[in-house]
Amino acid sequence: MKEFALRTLTSVVFVAVMVAGLLVPYAAGALFLVIMAQSMNEFYRMALGGSFRYVTGLSILACGTAYIVLYGIRAFGLSAAWFAAPVIVLLLMLAAIVLSCKVEDASRIAYVFVPQVIIALPLMCTPYLLFPQGQMDGTLLLSVFIVIWLSDVGAYLVGSTLGQRPGSKRLAPHISPKKSWWGFFGGVICAVLIAAILHFAGICKLGIWHTLALGAVTSIASVFGDLLESLWKRHFGVKDSGKCIPGHG
């Protein structure tokens, strides 16, 4: 009960911070920058422990700098020449790997590049979603998060009822034994319905078919992203990948 209360409280706070960040001008840039840095740091701690801190630090700095430049381009018309800054940091990271890491470290050092692809790269797209026409409009990203949050609730409700019946097929039993196909499709259907509501409420300004597709794709991507995270945690033998948000590992 205490764990549930903690999860609920932190969820409410997280949602409030995300909504405020997406609606308050220019706050979203700082919000996603912090999320990127913390998420990458948590992955590195899970995968590498305290090893290669100088390399992982340069990796986070390079991705963070690239995000700042992209945000500056969309929000303030910053010159693309500023991309030289993250490129220089990235080259320093590669130099640090080549000059200081041993041959037997090669398989482990490869984990340095994983969060650059699965965490930093998607977040680098957010400035283009926040400034679709040159002016800040956080409603599209807000719609994405609303779909994720509520489809997750729908997936849980359907999965915990219909998905627990005898004979119900598991989605990926070797990774997450509790996830069922009932929950998966329940979440997708819920996501499409929520997306439609957001469209007709005027929150999501995309066309109706694009909005419905956004709902379905977002739900599917969130499920398999969650499974990928569970796969990493099983691989590294950890229960939680991080402790930044209490009650949410």
Name the predicted role of every residue range.
Residues 1-216:
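Membrane-embedded alpha-helical bundles of polytopic integral membrane proteins
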Residues 221:
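Extracellular/periplasmic solute-recognition and catalytic clefts
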Residues 234-249:
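Interfacial loop-to-transmembrane junctions
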